Amino acid sequence: MARSPCCEKNGLKKGPWTSEEDQKLVDYIQKHGYGNWRTLPKNAGLQRCGKSCRLRWTNYLRPDIKRGRFSFEEEETIIQLHSFLGNKWSAIAARLPGRTDNEIKNFWNTHIRKKLLRMGIDPVTHSPRLDLLDISSILASSLYNSSSHHMNMSRLMMDTNRRHHQQHPLVNPEILKLATSLFSQNQNQNLVVDHDSRTQEKQTVYSQTGVNQYQTNQYFENTITQELQSSMPPFPNEARQFNNMDHHFNGFGEQNLVSTSTTSVQDCYNPSFNDYSSSNFVLDPSYSDQSFNFANSVLNTPSSSPSPTTLNSSYINSSSCSTEDEIESYCSNLMKFDIPDFLDVNGFII
């Protein structure tokens, strides 16, 4: 006896499911379970066939469905299971919790199959096929630029010859030679690029090291200069005190010298000064003393003052005998004097 169709064509709804239909199906399965999919639509009050209800529940409405992109581990599992099971998507979905058979089939046809073809692998037998290998995409792909994913062409040819013992080879040997040369050339270019990048990195490191060393030297020089300036004794203050004292003594000597020289020169050139004669002043032995006492010898009054007659005669004689040379010698002798020992300034010099 032949099996009757799952649903009658008259009065059944086809097309997308509405939210009301989804809610009715979920409520019925949560209360009674799905049971027999042939009788479920009639019991749940749905104008759908049993197959449509099963697919709607399995692929969209069941609570344990895993949404989102497939992970790398799930992709590897699908490839391995497909190499053993083939296109048995329900069996593959049973080993991937949370994934549906329809979702796995769509992911295989849209992503995994195309990826295997680009890698030169037959998606049916999972064996290498160089006639399916897209060399341009491999050379442009960053996956094969890394050293860990370079394809070994000689190993690939050995595996092909071992697995397929046929009279006619699968691939033309000229294509194999071309592929091998392209891979080797690409590898050499990668080595040159890596060498250039490493050289540039070393030059950058050397330049940065030189700049850092120069900045460090400048920092240490500034630090040493500041420490020396902070540790120096207050020499400027002592020098200022010494300059004040030196100025004081110089002012003292200049004042006495100016007053004395002025008085002496006036005494020399004044013909009518009292109590002193120019001859006595010039010939006074006290001027041989090289000290500051010459002012006292000039200003002190002699013990015995001569008479006016003697003064006049001595003044006339001195006037007749003195010349310009004597005046110059007198002035030069007047400027010659030594600083006494008690004014020794060596003690002030540090």
Swiss-Prot record:
The keyword Electron transport does not apply. Transmembrane segments: none annotated. Disruption phenotype: No visible phenotype under normal growth conditions, but mutant plant show increased susceptibility to the herbivore Pieris rapae (white cabbage butterfly) feeding. One of its GO terms (molecular function) is DNA-binding transcription factor activity. Residues 37-61, 89-112 bind DNA. It is found in: Nucleus. Residues 9-65, 66-116 form the HTH myb-type domain. GO terms for cellular component: nucleus. Induction: Induced by light. Induced by wounding, salt stress and abscisic acid. Induced by the lepidopteran herbivore Pieris rapae (white cabbage butterfly) feeding. It holds the Pfam family Myb_DNA-binding. Expressed in rosette leaves, cauline leaves and flowers. One of its GO terms (biological process) is response to osmotic stress. Keywords: DNA-binding, Nucleus, Plant defense, Repeat, Stress response, Transcription, Transcription regulation. Its main location: nucleus. Probable transcription factor that may function in osmotic stress and wounding signaling pathways. Contributes to basal resistance against the herbivore Pieris rapae (white cabbage butterfly) feeding. This is Transcription factor MYB102.
